[in-house]
Design a protein with these regions (language model features):
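The feature captures the beta-strand-to-loop junction immediately N-terminal to the Walker
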Residues: 33-35
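Helix-to-loop junction immediately C-terminal to a conserved catalytic motif
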Residues: 48
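Conserved ABC transporter NBD signature motif
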Residues: 56-68
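Conserved ABC ATPase "signature" region
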Residues: 98, 105-123, 175
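Conserved ABC ATPase signature
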Residues: 127-131, 135
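A short, proline-enriched helix->beta-strand linker immediately N-terminal to the Walker B motif
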Residues: 146-150
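Catalytic Walker B motif of ABC-type/P-loop ATPase nucleotide-binding domains
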Residues: 152-155
Length: 251
């Protein structure tokens, strides 16, 4: 269980996050949305232990997070800068496992399983510069899941790819959730994406940020890009989230 308790974050006199209290249950896919500049990335950095809060706390299984926990992995938006260009896909995915005290055979197994899960077995010995943008982001995701985190944090991971690649990566995330059962916190600006992927949607207000609303997504677990997005429940929830974000922008 990841719990955020009265979290606040200020930069000098500027209050970015005012007061956030929310819980994230094991195995839940949580999408975090809100107006541009509302502090979504700042919140994610506080949750991951990369940035200390000004007030309140983040607790993982009852223990206050003061540094990046071993149970967490983070996937960034800029995949091109998160991969080592001199390493192959195999080597990039294996990199964070080197200090876990695992046998070489176990590292090989975890790497190959993660690469297979993201559909890159055929490219496992290629370098990042030999991959498309979507394949590079798949490599970043493989590296995160090979680490076997309890919680996967993702900061607008599909913002820099084209629409078709984005749809493919969204479906990849649904398969990863089903396969690994990890808790996922997924920051996005894309309302359709939040409804399509999420078990819950956390809507943030404009800055200084509070939780404006938490919505449960009533869609079936099995989803696809056409049928799900034509579902009246999908359309209704998308409109509701859009109205909430517009209201937040208006103050």
């Amino acid at each position: 269980m990841l719990r955020v308790e009265q979290l606040s974050k200020s930069f000098g006199q500027v209050e970015a996050i005012k007061d956030i209290t929310v819980e994230f249950a094991q195995g839940e896919f949580n999408c975090i949305v809100g107006p541009s500049g509302c502090g979504k990335t700042t919140l994610l950095k506080c949750l991951s232990g990369l940035m200390p809060p000004t007030g309140g706390r983040v607790a993982l299984d009852g223990v206050t997070v003061t540094r990046p926990p071993k149970q967490m992995a983070l996937v960034f938006q800029d995949y091109s800068r998160s991969l080592f260009p001199w390493m192959t896909v195999r080597q990039n995915v294996a990199f964070p496992l080197r200090n876990k005290g695992l046998a070489k055979s176990e590292i090989t197994r975890l790497v190959e399983e993660a690469v297979e899960a993201v559909g890159l077995t055929h490219a496992i010995d290629r370098y990042p510069w030999q991959l498309s943008g979507g394949m590079q982001q798949r490599t970043s995701i493989a590296r995160a899941i090979a680490y076997q985190p309890e919680i996967l944090l993702m900061d607008e991971p599909f913002a820099s790819v084209d629409a078709q690649t984005r749809a493919n990566l969204e479906d990849l995330m649904l398969s990863i959730k089903a396969r690994y059962g990890m808790t996922i916190l997924f920051v996005t600006h894309d309302i359709d994406e939040s409804v399509y992927l999420g078990d819950r949607i956390v809507v943030l207000s404009s800055s200084p940020t509070v939780v404006q609303e938490i919505l449960t997504v009533p869609l079936p677990v099995a989803r696809d890009q056409i049928t799900t997005k034509e579902d009246p429940q999908f359309l209704h929830l998308r409109s509701h989230v859009f109205r909430e974000i517009m209201a937040a922008q208006a103050g």
